[in-house]
C-alpha cells in the first residue's frame, strides 16, 4: 500500500476530476459548432489518455490519501449547497414539484447538521483510495465516456436539425455531460462517504438535466421520476453517513467494511447504503427511472447505461461486497438483485422496441451483478 499526503498521484487524480470540470465550464459559454467540436475532441482525447496513464501506471498498487479536515471538506459542503440550489430552482421555481424539493431539503439539512456536530470528532482513515477496481472504473468512465462525448457532436447536430421544435441547448448538453464525467471520477476515487455523497448528488442532478433535455412533457415527467428516485437514495446515503459517523466516529467506506468483518453491528448502515445503490443502479422497484430515460437523445442513454449513472450504484455495492456476508443486508442484496435479473430478463425478451430492449437488458445485467455481490 502506498500512502500519500498530497503529492504525485494526488495531483494526477485532481487533474482527472478538474479537467472535465473545466471543459464543462468552457462548453457552457461556447455557441459555435467548430469551436465546440474542437474543445470536445481535445478534452475527450486528454481525458481518455489520462485515464489510460493512471490505470497502467498504478495498476497493482493500492494508493491511499488521508486529506483530513481540510479545505476540501468545506468545498464539499459548498458543492452540496449548490446542488441543492439547482434542485430547488427546477422543483420550486420552474416546475413547482415542491415535494421533491422537500426531499432534497431534508437530506441537505441532515448532512449540514452532521457536519456541524461532528466537526473535529471524526477519524480520517482514508479519504481517497485507488485500487484495481477503482482503476477499472476510471477506464470505463474516461475512455467510454470520452467516446460518447465525441459521438455526441455529430449526433446532436443531426438531432437539432431533425427536431426543429426542440430548443438548441447543445452548449448546456455538453456542459452537463462533462460535469457528469467529472463527478464520476470523483465518486470512484472517494473512500470518505461525505465526499462520495457530494459526487453522488451531482450525478443525480446531471441525469435529471440530460433526461429532460428536449423539455417535452414526457421528458420533464421522466426526468423528475429519475430525480426523486435518486434523491430517495441520496436520503438513504445521508442517513447512513449520520448513523456511522455518530456511532463509530468515521465516514470511511473501508472502515465500514472492516467493522463488518470484525463482527460489529453495522447492518443498518449497510442496508441504507444498499438502498442508495439500488436506486442508482435501477434495481426493482426503482427501475422505472432508467426506462423513462429512453426519451432522451441517444448519447444520454449511452452515458447512463455504460459509463456513469448505473455504474455508480453497482460500484458502491461491490465495494461493500466483503461486508455483506452472514448478515441480513447481504441477503437483501441477493434477493433484490436476483428478482431484478429474472423479471428484467423476461421483460427484455418480450420487447420489440430497441431502446426498451437495451434498458431491460441493462437492468437485468445489473441485477445479476448485485445478486452475485
Feature-to-residue mapping (PLM):
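Hydrophobic transmembrane alpha-helices and their helix-loop junctions in integral membrane proteins
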Residues: 147-196, 206-373
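Generic enzyme active-site microenvironment
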Residues: 129, 199, 303
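Transmembrane helix-loop-helix hairpins at membrane boundaries of multipass inner-membrane proteins
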Residues: 3-15, 25-175, 250-261, 288, ...
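Hydrophobic membrane-targeting signal helices
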Residues: 18, 22, 26, 55, ...
Amino acid at each position: 500500500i502506498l500512502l500519500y499526503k498530497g503529492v504525485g498521484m494526488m495531483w494526477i487524480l485532481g487533474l482527472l476530476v478538474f479537467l472535465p470540470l473545466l471543459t464543462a465550464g468552457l462548453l457552457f459559454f461556447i455557441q459555435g459548432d467548430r469551436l465546440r467540436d474542437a474543445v470536445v475532441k481535445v478534452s475527450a482525447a486528454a481525458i481518455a489518455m489520462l485515464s489510460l496513464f493512471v490505470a497502467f501506471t498504478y495498476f497493482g498498487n493500492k494508493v491511499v490519501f488521508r486529506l483530513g479536515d481540510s479545505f476540501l471538506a468545506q468545498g464539499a459542503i459548498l458543492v452540496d449547497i449548490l446542488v441543492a440550489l439547482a434542485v430547488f430552482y427546477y422543483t420550486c421555481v420552474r416546475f413547482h414539484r415542491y415535494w421533491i424539493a422537500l426531499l432534497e431539503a431534508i437530506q441537505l439539512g441532515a448532512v449540514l447538521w452532521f457536519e456541524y456536530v461532528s466537526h473535529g470528532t471524526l477519524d480520517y482513515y482514508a479519504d481517497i483510495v485507488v485500487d484495481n477496481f477503482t482503476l477499472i472504473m476510471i477506464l470505463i468512465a474516461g475512455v467510454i465516456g470520452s467516446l460518447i462525448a465525441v459521438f455526441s457532436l455529430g449526433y446532436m447536430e443531426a438531432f437539432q436539425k431533425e427536431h426543429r421544435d426542440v430548443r438548441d441547448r447543445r452548449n448546456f448538453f455538453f456542459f452537463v455531460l462533462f460535469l457528469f464525467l467529472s463527478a464520476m471520477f470523483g465518486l470512484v476515487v472517494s473512500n470518505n462517504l461525505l465526499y462520495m455523497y457530494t459526487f453522488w448528488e451531482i450525478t443525480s442532478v446531471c441525469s435529471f438535466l440530460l433526461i429532460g433535455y428536449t423539455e417535452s412533457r414526457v421528458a420533464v415527467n421522466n426526468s423528475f421520476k429519475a430525480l426523486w428516485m435518486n434523491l430517495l437514495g441520496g436520503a438513504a446515503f445521508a442517513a447512513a453517513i449520520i448513523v456511522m459517523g455518530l456511532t463509530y466516529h468515521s465516514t470511511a467506506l473501508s472502515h465500514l467494511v472492516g467493522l463488518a468483518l470484525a463482527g460489529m453491528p453495522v447492518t443498518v448502515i449497510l442496508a441504507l447504503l444498499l438502498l442508495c445503490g439500488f436506486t442508482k443502479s435501477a434495481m426493482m422497484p426503482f427501475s422505472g427511472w432508467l426506462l423513462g430515460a429512453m426519451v432522451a437523445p441517444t448519447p444520454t442513454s449511452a452515458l447512463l447505461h455504460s459509463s456513469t449513472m448505473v455504474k455508480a450504484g453497482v460500484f458502491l455495492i461491490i465495494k461493500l461486497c466483503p461486508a455483506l456476508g452472514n448478515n441480513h443486508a447481504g441477503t437483501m442484496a441477493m434477493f433484490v438483485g436476483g428478482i431484478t435479473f429474472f423479471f428484467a430478463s423476461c421483460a427484455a425478451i418480450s420487447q420489440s422496441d430497441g431502446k426498451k430492449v437495451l434498458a431491460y437488458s441493462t437492468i437485468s445485467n445489473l441485477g445479476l451483478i448485485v445478486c452475485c455481490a
